[in-house]
Amino acid sequence: MFRGVTSISIDNKGRIAIPTRYRAELREQHEGVLVCTVDIRQPCLLLYPLHEWETVEQKLLALSNFDPMQRRIQRVMQGFATECEMDAAGRILLSPTLRQHAQLEQQIMLVGQLNKFEIWQDKQWQSQIAEDLALGGSAEMLNCEALKNLSL
């Protein structure tokens, strides 16, 4: 399970270092292989351990190729999906295309989301989290059926 927010630098080759606390698990359970793709709703990237990505792929495969919206989702998520193998130093390479999509520069935020990470450009993350926190007490959130029984 991935949790927390970590500020990470991108080196001049486009590599990021996975935080040390996750490396052993990723190597042991996923052979150090991750898959990075774009988020279809946000200007960020999604980084999955390979086995988690394979579950997502099955869901994408189940979508209809004949429905234009479903086909678009397949095209974007699968089309951008790139395998990233951790090197001996725990780094992965983010392709220029992926970095461009999320407008990644020198400093990024790696955000644990249980079964995956989100990768955000640091200023975009600050803006998004401020918006998310402001929504906390809104009528929209209070009326959301899926959240009515959520107890934290």
Swiss-Prot record:
InterPro entries: MraZ, MraZ_C, MraZ_dom, MraZ_N, MraZ_sf, SpoVT-AbrB_dom, SpoVT-AbrB_sf. The keyword Transcription regulation applies. Residues 5-52, 81-124 form the SpoVT-AbrB domain. SUPFAM superfamilies: AbrB/MazE/MraZ-like. CDD domains: MraZ_C (cd16321), MraZ_N (cd16320). GO terms for molecular function: DNA-binding transcription factor activity; transcription cis-regulatory region binding. Keywords: Cytoplasm, DNA-binding, Repeat, Transcription, Transcription regulation. GO terms for biological process: negative regulation of DNA-templated transcription initiation. It is found in: Cytoplasm, Nucleoid. Its main location: cytoplasm. It holds the Pfam family MraZ. One of its GO terms (cellular component) is nucleoid. Belongs to the MraZ family. Forms oligomers. PANTHER family: TRANSCRIPTIONAL REGULATOR MRAZ. This is Transcriptional regulator MraZ.
